[in-house]
Amino acid sequence: MASPREENVYMAKLAEQAERYEEMVEFMEKVVAAADGAEELTVEERNLLSVAYKNVIGARRASWRIISSIEQKEESRGNEDHVASIKEYRSKIESELTSICNGILKLLDSKLIGSAATGDSKVFYLKMKGDYHRYLAEFKTGAERKEAAENTLSAYKAAQDIANAELAPTHPIRLGLALNFSVFYYEILNSPDRACNLAKQAFDEAIAELDTLGEESYKDSTLIMQLLRDNLTLWTSDMQDDGTDEIKEATPKPDDNE
């Protein structure tokens, strides 16, 4: 008979298939609670947790961007009544974003980072911590934005130190970290030069060791390398003309083997 932990993993997969991501988060939170403080999640479990939260936050991030864009248009037209309604609605989405980010950040700080024993799991969770502080920095303002940006930077830097020491340049988690860290420099810190340097270095180091890639991670690694290159192309053209194409980020997959 399956243990409660195995049952919750199965239910999380079921919720994912049904695209019921809020429930997927709940099942995976039960898995984290069931794992003893000193016991790591399996690679499959941590990927399921990441996918669940990424989808729940992703829907709200998309909503926030759409509403913010409409707000700008209405402001430029001088429709003050509409702007007031939009601001109120945006604030509701921001409350949801804050709650979701705080939920996973609490889990990371209280359990997941402390129980991580391997280099790849430490980098995985620290990258995740950086990602969710970055999502807060996307919409927070003033002192709250500054704090979120500082927390993002320290989490990504801690992850980068471990990744550089313990993971190959072609490792999908190391590449995914470089991708998201460079997006942070570009979007949050408005440092296109730093963003491009970080992305280019990660890409070049991976290219130099491409022949050492195992078959199981080849697809994941080359996909992220392509995203790094896409962003580099976009950013270098943006520095010449103010483009607004979509910036690529690392997206977790439930079947990652790394």
UniProtKB/Swiss-Prot annotation:
Signal peptide: none annotated. Gene3D superfamilies: 14-3-3 domain (1.20.190.20). GO terms for cellular component: cytoplasm. One of its GO terms (biological process) is protein localization. Residues 238-258 are annotated as: Disordered. Residues 245-258 have a biased composition (Basic and acidic residues). SUPFAM superfamilies: 14-3-3 protein. InterPro entries: 14-3-3, 14-3-3_CS, 14-3-3_dom_sf, 14-3-3_domain. Belongs to the 14-3-3 family. This is 14-3-3 protein 6. It comes from Solanum lycopersicum (Tomato). The lineage of its organism: Eukaryota, Viridiplantae, Streptophyta, Embryophyta, Tracheophyta.
